[in-house]
Amino acid sequence: MRQNIILECVETGERLYLTSKNKRNNPERIELKKYSPKLRRRAIFKEVK
């Protein structure tokens, strides 16, 4: 079963991206590199609970 999640930038704290993940295959929190307009570069975004 897929669940929608919000990704928050570690450096700026902004919540920009919505995505989904399969809880059964990935029970731990997701960490992705995405583009941050404030920083004007790619940054690490972590899953918000």
From Swiss-Prot:
Q: Which InterPro entries match?
A: Ribosomal_bL33, Ribosomal_bL33_CS, Ribosomal_bL33_sf, Ribosomal_zn-bd
- List cellular component terms (GO): cytoplasm; ribonucleoprotein complex; ribosome
Q: The organism sits in which domain of life?
A: Bacteria
- Keyword terms of this UniProt record: Ribonucleoprotein, Ribosomal protein
Per the record, the coiled-coil ranges are none
- Molecular function terms, GO-annotated: structural constituent of ribosome
- Is-annotated flag, keyword Ribonucleoprotein? yes
Q: Name one GO biological process term.
A: translation
Q: Does the keyword Ribonucleoprotein apply?
A: yes
One Pfam family here: Ribosomal_L33
Task: Name the HAMAP family on file.
Answer: Ribosomal_bL33
Family statement drawn from the similarity comment of this UniProt entry: Belongs to the bacterial ribosomal protein bL33 family.
Which NCBIfam families has this protein been placed in? PRK00504.1, PRK00595.1, rpmG_bact
Protein name stated in the entry: Large ribosomal subunit protein bL33A
Gene (UniProt):
rpmG1
